[in-house]
């Protein structure tokens, strides 16, 4: 006589198995017969970066503060103020920027126009640049221009920064991208919990569960899709049962101290983001807890930030252009000479 075995299957709802977006510069892709290097695993890394900037208040506040500080220090006779500001934003958000350069027949610069960096792709030798508003869409149009070519009357000047992975730049806060994702997910989770007015941390026991393994997996999948994830936090559970004996049991888990865990996670991820920028939180309006911050301490922190972060960023940005295209000015709008490397 065979032993009667009970099969118990435990499913974990809400597991996170999607890896963070990666920069992969080894794959060559084709788009409208153009051969370019993929910008990320799915050629969407800059879109991912920009979305992170738009959704994370801390990241946006730091980047906006840095750009504002740099913009006050630069001027150009060849680039409009608006385009110069956009170049600075791309420089900090993506780690690089791109502009369209128009030259006369004698190769004198006539005009420089800003190009959204997320729309640029390049070939493996960084000699050809491709521009499209709809990468990945078969209906998108692609423009092809020589890259960083001073002998062409129409070209793209492409700056990929000092920190690169192959042909594309890496933003200075790359190490904090996971923390930025967590910050955004925490906000989404709490918003969903408030909207649904129900915050559950439960085990669902499916009674009379004599189902095949395939059916169990399908039930688990459906529950995961409907109730797991930050965007589904706090949804009401509605079940239909043929009898009370066969009803599903929902057991609420108490004592997990989720509030404390979220507070600790929120604090550690914020610190991680500021560390990536080598910034003190108080410089961007986030005051330290349980202790004061004097004017002297603020001034010292600002001086260190200017010396170690802002000045190097400023010099690198100005030197990335041809001499005289972008210049540094003092508080009286007087030009400060910079020795080109």
Question: Each predicted region: which residue ranges?
Answer:
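Structured, contiguous alpha/beta core segments that scaffold functional sites
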Residues: 1-243
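A contiguous, surface-oriented mixed alpha/beta subdomain in the mid-to-C-terminal portion of proteins
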Residues: 162-341
